[in-house]
Amino acid sequence: MAQQRRGGFKRRKKVDFIAANKIEVVDYKDTELLKRFISERGKILPRRVTGTSAKNQRKVVNAIKRARVMALLPFVAEDQN
């Protein structure tokens, strides 16, 4: 039988960074913004991790993919060895 978890910790509410900073257009040339949504291995972080809304996540994903094709962002991270 599963036991109920008691006490624990309160989760931090994730805030949509794009909506909070009133960013209208997610531009593929703005690599500093896009790097917030990429893991250290170069993978696009999911909504449940970043806290972005579905609409803004689509904008971010499209901008990241465009930036990768234009060689502004890497497809994969460099090997650390």
From Swiss-Prot:
NCBIfam families: S18. Part of the 30S ribosomal subunit. Forms a tight heterodimer with protein bS6. The keyword Ribonucleoprotein applies. Keywords: Ribonucleoprotein, Ribosomal protein, RNA-binding, rRNA-binding. Binds as a heterodimer with protein bS6 to the central domain of the 16S rRNA, where it helps stabilize the platform of the 30S subunit. It comes from Lactococcus lactis subsp. cremoris (strain MG1363). One of its GO terms (molecular function) is small ribosomal subunit rRNA binding. This is Small ribosomal subunit protein bS18. The lineage of its organism: Bacteria, Bacillati, Bacillota, Bacilli, Lactobacillales.
